[in-house]
């Protein structure tokens, strides 16, 4: 029996990261030729932010050299799992990844990508990362409308980014779990990536104990967060900061990895 006609969003792509479930409509065009989005990059170039992925893998290897096996990386705002897959693959036999994604449909793709790439050292969690555990309501975008879904902000504010469609923060919302990283009581954390669309400071507050005890390397998207507050929070905890594209790389002053970095632009 023939099924109903329906538009397909998620497809399988043979990418440089492996076989990936990706939304072919995950893009926002800024002109006739240029656009952005995780899906856009993968389908146009076979890769997503390869330089950033390479840097993260190198930093994980450095943590292994200085702290031994058992490296743990947290991918907060994991999207469909490019970083998660690459990290888990690189750390086979000596490290693991906890990937956290708030958008339900994207979380399904993340979990599928972990499975299809046989990353038995990676785990996915459907939640938003914040300052305290609980629940929150987040918007439900239309995944059939071309948009940069990874740019979706979970909280409404005066200058929310236009991702390719209007977002309603009061109707058709979904209640999801909200986690603070400290609630996991992890004995060791080596690396935390925060790409949570303006909730980076909240996520840091919820990881304060973990950061103070483990002094992990932090890679934080900075374009939607107050720079002065972010720099101050990290500096108070002994971190040295470097600008890496749209991200802020923070390495504790006592971390031997700091001496291995090539000269880079220090954060002001």
Predicted regions and their residues:
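Conserved acidic-Pro-Pro-aromatic motif
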Residues: 17, 71, 88-99, 182-268
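Short, solvent-exposed polar/charged micro-motifs at secondary-structure junctions
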Residues: 76-78, 132-137, 187-188, 251-254
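S-adenosyl-L-methionine
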Residues: 1-103, 108-113, 117, 164-170, ...
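Catalytic metal-binding/acid-base residues of hydrolase active sites
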Residues: 79, 103, 130, 197, ...
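Glycine-rich adenosyl-binding loop in Rossmann-like folds that engage adenosine-containing cofactors
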Residues: 23-53, 120, 125-187, 261-264
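Short N-terminal helix/helix-N-cap motif within the alpha/beta-hydrolase-1
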Residues: 82-85, 108, 134, 201-205
């Amino acid at each position: 029996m023939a099924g109903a006609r329906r538009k397909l969003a998620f497809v399988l792509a043979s990418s440089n990261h492996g076989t990936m479930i990706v939304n072919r409509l995950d893009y926002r065009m800024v002109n006739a030729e240029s656009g952005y989005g995780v899906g856009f990059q993968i389908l146009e170039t076979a890769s997503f932010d390869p330089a950033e992925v390479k840097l993260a893998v190198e930093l994980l290897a450095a943590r292994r050299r200085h702290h031994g096996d058992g490296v743990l990386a947290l991918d907060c705002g994991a999207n469909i799992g490019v970083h998660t897959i690459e990290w888990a693959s690189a750390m086979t036999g000596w490290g693991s990844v906890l990937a956290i994604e708030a958008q339900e449909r994207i979380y399904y793709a993340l979990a599928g990508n972990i499975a299809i790439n046989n990353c038995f050292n990676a785990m996915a969690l459907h939640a938003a990362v914040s300052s305290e555990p609980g629940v929150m309501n987040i918007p439900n975008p239309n995944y059939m409308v071309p948009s940069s879904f990874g740019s979706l902000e979970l909280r409404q504010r005066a200058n929310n980014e236009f991702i390719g469609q209007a977002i309603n923060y009061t109707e058709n919302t979904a209640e999801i779990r909200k986690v603070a990283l400290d609630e996991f009581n992890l004995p060791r954390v080596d690396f935390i990536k925060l790409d949570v669309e303006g909730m980076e400071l909240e996520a840091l507050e919820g990881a304060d104990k973990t950061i103070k005890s483990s002094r992990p390397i932090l890679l934080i998207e900075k374009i939607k967060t107050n720079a002065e507050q972010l720099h101050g929070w990290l500096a108070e905890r002994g971190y040295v900061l470097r600008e890496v594209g749209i991200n802020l790389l923070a390495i504790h002053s006592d971390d031997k990895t700091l001496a291995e970095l090539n000269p880079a632009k220090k954060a002001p």
